[in-house]
Amino acid sequence: MTNTLKISLKPNEKIYINGAVIRVDRKVTIELMNDVQFLLESHVIQADQASTPLRQLYFIVQVMLINPAGADDAREMFRRSLPLLIASFEDAEICSALKQIDRMVGEDHIYEALKAIRSLYPLERRALGGNDDVPGAPRPLAVGARY
């Protein structure tokens, strides 16, 4: 981020900035005037919501931003997971985007990587046959993975 960025928050909303969790008590607009890593509360997913391959990847990447102390472990998990994930999808658009996401993470553009992963959810839903929210439904199995 090279320009300033204004973000409006609602009462009791949280924002994660460089690993700090900030909650506002009233409607506010904050202006980020330098390079920061941030994530809005509405974009945070919990572990139990990581129910598809791309949501699992999203969860791993979000840890890099929310928990800087655990970022190295999350990066290692990302590096191990990404090749398996690419191998598990036949959709060329998803695979190409995952390679771009790898570049973003490598360049420490975590917010952009999260945004790119979110944009793939509709493609993933189609690749999964529209059953990504059905517990126990078949999922792509990574090459070399075991049940």
Swiss-Prot record:
Cited InterPro entries: Flagellum_FlbT
Keywords for this protein: Bacterial flagellum biogenesis, Repressor, RNA-binding
Keyword ATP-binding: no
Pfam families registered for this protein in UniProt: FlbT
GO biological process per UniProt: bacterial-type flagellum organization; mRNA catabolic process; negative regulation of bacterial-type flagellum assembly
Record-level Gene Ontology MF annotations: mRNA 5'-UTR binding
Family: Belongs to the FlbT family.
Functional summary from the UniProt entry: Has a post-transcriptional repressor function in flagellum biogenesis. Associates with the 5'-UTR of fljK mRNA and promotes its degradation.
NCBIfam families: PRK00794.1-1
Protein name, per record: Probable flagellum biosynthesis repressor protein FlbT
Organism: Mesorhizobium japonicum (strain LMG 29417 / CECT 9101 / MAFF 303099)
